[in-house]
From Swiss-Prot:
Residues 2-133 form the HTH rrf2-type domain. This is HTH-type transcriptional regulator NsrR. Residues 28-51 bind DNA. Binds 1 [2Fe-2S] cluster per subunit. The keyword Transcription applies. GO terms for cellular component: cytosol. It comes from Oceanobacillus iheyensis (strain DSM 14371 / CIP 107618 / JCM 11309 / KCTC 3954 / HTE831).
Length: 147
């Protein structure tokens, strides 16, 4: 099972932004440089995070991005659920494309679904705050000095 790149990038934006102080703004250019990701991809991700009310953007020359709420209030499991809205792990999960002849009697779907529920249950135990607790290490890996 893989998360979409979009979800990965959203998590990276939130981690990067969460490492900034309340007065300090992140910007797409620096996030793109640190993670070596296209600025265009990041613009789309930031737009979605803004619609989800997880970040706010400030326009203008000194503008940028900051968290819209404390890192402790951004639940990782709920975020991933929202971004990964089509967890089709098996063909039989999607009634529109399911052509499996054993689907009506197969228990594999139930086993996989139970695992998926457990996956999200674990993710929902964590917030963005948990992901940035090792702040000094993350900043060093990104080549950023704390202001």
């Amino acid at each position: 099972m893989n998360l979409k790149k979009y979800t990965d990038y959203a998590l990276r934006v939130l981690i990067f932004t969460g490492l900034k102080s309340d007065q300090e703004l992140a910007n797409i250019k620096e996030i793109a440089e640190v993670y070596q990701i296209s600025q265009e991809h990041l613009r789309k991700v930031v737009h979605e995070l803004t619609k989800m009310e997880l970040v706010v953007t400030i326009r203008g020359r000194n503008g940028g991005i900051k968290l819209a709420k404390p890192a402790s209030e951004i639940n990782i499991g709920l975020l991933i659920r929202q971004l990964e809205n089509d967890f089709v792990l098996l063909e039989c999960f999607d009634k529109g494309t399911n052509h499996c002849v054993i689907s009506p009697g197969c228990t594999l779907k139930h086993v996989i679904n139970k695992a998926l529920v457990a996956f999200f249950k674990v993710l929902e135990e964590y917030t963005l705050e948990d992901l940035i607790k090792n702040e000094e290490e993350l900043l060093a890996l990104m080549g950023i000095e704390k202001v």
